Amino acid sequence: MENNHHLAKDSLDELNPKRGKGEHETQVSQYTVVEEATIPQSLVKTSRPADHKVMEASKVADTRTAWSTKIPAVLLPVFVINIALFKYLVFANFSTKDRVLFGLGNGGINIFSMWLLLATYETWFRSIKEVIVACGAGIRSFPQKRGVNMLYAILKLTFVNAFAIPLLMFFRSHFEQWRLGCPLVERVIGVMLNVAYFIIEIENPGLFTRVFNKYCDCLFAIRDILNRN
């Protein structure tokens, strides 16, 4: 047995002349450990294909991102056109001073939201909502910064004003007691509410979305009740 052991050592030394005596023993022991730790291929699990729902969600996200690249180019001319169309409608009874004060407040975004008032039918309203949500999703894909959250807040604030304006006009025309008696005070309050909204939305993104969805559902319910009567 000892002769066989010496012969094995000599043969290994001949194959590796640069190695010193006894180094092959360490190599053999390391090799043996590796062999013992080898995992059979039959036990290795292959990666599963992506779930169908996950793939569909990724497609929707890609579609929203694609929409977000087109929306700004479309909304800019629409914004300018609607300012021209609704200028006389909104400012019909306003003096020059009132126009300036109203414009310095939130007149610009309210004029744009007048275009959304044309969404009389629920199907068209839903499509506009989807476009704005898609645009917001594209904005949200950018790094989260305060300015980015403000852009998204502007989108949703525009949508809210689209319903706040007709409700305000309705109360003013049918219920005189709802008027404060001072248009300037009313506009200042409106600006303060918008500023408060910005603070809430920027500091707590997503909070307003849930309230906004409930708000839209209530508006649709009120509309259905009025249509039945």
Swiss-Prot record:
Region: Disordered, residue numbers: 1-27
Chief place where the protein resides: endoplasmic reticulum
One GO term describing the cellular component: endoplasmic reticulum
TM region(s), chain numbering: 71-91, 100-120, 151-171, 188-208
Top-level taxon of the source organism: Eukaryota
Swiss-Prot/TrEMBL keywords: Endoplasmic reticulum, Membrane, Transmembrane, Transmembrane helix
Disruption phenotype: Simultaneous knockout of wtf15 results in normal vegetative cell population growth. Simultaneous knockout of wtf15, wtf11 and wtf7 results in normal spore viability.
A GO BP entry: meiotic drive
Membrane topology: Multi-pass membrane protein
Annotated localization: Endoplasmic reticulum membrane
Residue stretches of biased makeup (Basic and acidic residues): 1-26
Coiled-coil portions: none
Family per similarity comment: Belongs to the WTF family.
Role summary: May act in meiotic drive.
Additional free-text comment from the UniProt record: Although the gene is capable of encoding two isoforms, RNA sequencing data show no evidence of alternative transcripts.
Protein's name according to its UniProt entry: Wtf element wtf14
Organism: Schizosaccharomyces pombe (strain 972 / ATCC 24843)
Gene: wtf14
